[in-house]
């Protein structure tokens, strides 16, 4: 387990599990959370039902829709039995505000692109 995963796991975030082939969210749904993959794999699926990417342990997804209150432009499905950590918008922004100043600058720059 990576140091990042250990830190995130110990942060008190709620965990949620999905069985293989379960939909996490569908295109055009309103976002509820950003998700951190604790174990398993998640497929990102286009509007045309093409798998455009597979995310693995330690990766984050759903953050853009969640942070900017935009409907999901893709769907997310558990490719394997998967455990996710739920990251609420207020928790994410709180972590950004308490981050190192250089990291905050990087996050702000990336969010503008």
Region locations from a protein language model:
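Polybasic "coupling" helices that flank or enter modular domains
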Residues: 108-113
